[in-house]
Amino acid sequence: MADHIVVRVFAGPDGGGGNPLGIVEDGRTVPGEARQALAAELGFSETVFVDDPGAGLVDIRTPGAVLPFAGHPLVGLAWWLRRRGRGADVLRPPAGEVPTWQEGETTWIRARAGWAAGRRTRRFASVAEVDALPVPPPGEGWLYAWAWEDEAAGRVRARGFPRRGDGIVEDEATGAAALTLAAELGRDLVVRQGVGSVILTRCHGDGTVDLGGRVIVG
């Protein structure tokens, strides 16, 4: 198996939660045809391959597909590269240029909501209803189930269900889905997802959304 690092992205304030991410820091060691097999073997929601750290060129894989954009891999990779002294101010997945920066313990990226297409959001009446959902809920296609914890404060409870047949029945923390929800609501959010993850969003008038969270070595 190729050398890789595991970090947890969008960890909670107590260090719990966080979505595991596989990082292959030297993507040149894994040829294109072997990447999908490695992503499936690792079994994380996503694995990211760094093709050129200086230019920020990256390749994001789920266990079964290539993604043009995903939030948690880019937040996690931005943090890891800075920790290694190889930080890039811009990451370049296939979707486009993604600025990155650090504010204290929070790593941020900025992306366009349109890049997160295919993730449907559904509002529930209460946090209890979201928490009671089966894994996964009936149906097909990506579902981001959410309810207000505190609407005035912009606090949301959410769970993410890929429902794509690749073994990931529930996503612990989904940056792209949180970005989609923030864009739909047109407001900044604090999203509590999974068993202890926290995702931060900040909306801008030009259609971009900032996505941030804590990252720790997994």
Language-model region placement:
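Active-site proximal loop and beta-alpha junction motif in alpha/beta enzyme cores
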Residues: 1-218
